[in-house]
């Protein structure tokens, strides 16, 4: 899994007035949870663009006053009107313990059912998984090259393909399916009448 580097500096004082002063300077107040202690720090707002404005999931390598921490993005707060970053929470990740994270689902191949007039529906865009930091994939790929109209790929089928990951979504949930469109149903009825 890709990692993004964010450099921060510790905050001396924590409070509404100080957080507002940081935001005026283009800095974002942040907190790192999950380690031995909570670390309050601030970072440049521009450092968060590759982390937030992407469909991909990344781990974060934080450097706060010379110390490095592995983390994941826990929560982001935006301003209600102008959509500027207000606050970012990070969760410290221990490399020896499994973590739960949402991984994007990608689709590869062309479904024969789509060529016959069906419609491809991606029902799950991100799947929750549990794995060690070193085993996290960039995405979960779904091969749809054998999907006919009315067929789907379920979580339990993907779990069989990825035995090293624990997929936390319900096993009977359809991730990707090909459904019949009105035009394809009409064509099938017309062919049946002949």
Q: Predicted regions: what is each one?
A:
Residues 1-194:
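Acidic, negatively charged sequence tracts
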């Amino acid at each position: 899994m890709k990692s993004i580097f964010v450099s921060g500096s510790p905050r001396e004082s924590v409070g509404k007035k100080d957080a507002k002063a940081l935001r005026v300077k283009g800095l974002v107040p942040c907190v790192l949870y999950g380690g031995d202690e909570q670390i309050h720090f601030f970072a440049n707002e521009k450092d968060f663009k590759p982390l937030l404005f992407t469909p991909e999931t990344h781990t974060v390598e934080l450097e706060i006053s010379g110390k490095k921490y592995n983390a994941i993005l826990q929560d982001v707060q935006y301003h209600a009107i102008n959509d500027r970053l207000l606050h970012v929470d990070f969760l410290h990740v221990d490399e020896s313990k499994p973590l739960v994270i949402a991984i994007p689902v990608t689709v590869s191949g062309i479904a024969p059912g789509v060529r016959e007039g069906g419609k491809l529906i991606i029902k799950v865009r991100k799947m929750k998984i549990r794995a060690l930091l070193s085993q996290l994939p960039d995405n979960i790929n779904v091969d749809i090259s054998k999907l006919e109209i009315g067929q789907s790929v379920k979580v339990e089928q993907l779990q069989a393909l990825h035995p090293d990951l624990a997929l936390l979504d319900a096993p009977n949930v359809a991730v990707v399916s090909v459904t019949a469109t009105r035009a394809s149903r009409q064509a099938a009825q017309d062919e049946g009448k002949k």
